[in-house]
Amino acid sequence: MNNLIITTRQSPVRLLVDYVATTILWTLFALFIFLFAMDLLTGYYWQSEARSRLQFYFLLAVANAVVLIVWALYNKLRFQKQQHHAAYQYTPQEYAESLAIPDELYQQLQKSHRMSVHFTSQGQIKMVVSEKALVRA
């Protein structure tokens, strides 16, 4: 995902804290998994009544993993093709026609960074006065 919708800048300290916390938590998670697997191999869990409960949790985890994998594959197939078409590139003449103004007035709109736009009573653009002309007047 190179084109993120929301991008926020973080300070290097905040980024470092995030990376360190993530590394510590993943290390602890791996340690807990390792210790649990070692206890399973020693046979202690298999001698108690917790065996059926552990089997249920294991089957539940496997079913959850299967559902997540199927859902991810479905989304990959669903969103594999680009659904949004690129926006149509209008020409300056088409813009001028859509605003019902002459090409010269459209060019003046394009050149001005700051302007005052005057409209007719029907809401069409009548005149554009750029900021330079406003300052001189």
Swiss-Prot record:
Required for the synthesis of poly-beta-1,6-N-acetyl-D-glucosamine (PGA), a biofilm adhesin polysaccharide. May assist the glycosyltransferase PgaC in the polymerization of PGA. The keyword Cell membrane applies. It is found in: Cell inner membrane. The chain crosses the membrane at residues 24-44, 54-74. InterPro entries: PGA_PgaD (IPR023829). Residues 45-53 are periplasmic. It is a multi-pass membrane protein. NCBIfam families: PGA_PgaD, PRK14585.1. It holds the Pfam family PgaD. Keywords: Cell inner membrane, Cell membrane, Membrane, Transmembrane, Transmembrane helix. Induction: Levels of this protein are positively controlled by the second messenger c-di-GMP (at protein level) at a post-transcriptional level. Increased levels of c-di-GMP lead to increased levels of PgaD. This is Biofilm PGA synthesis protein PgaD. GO terms for biological process: cell adhesion involved in biofilm formation; cell adhesion involved in single-species biofilm formation. Its main location: membrane. GO terms for cellular component: plasma membrane. Disruption phenotype: Cells lacking this gene do not synthesize PGA. Residues 1-23, 75-137 are cytoplasmic.
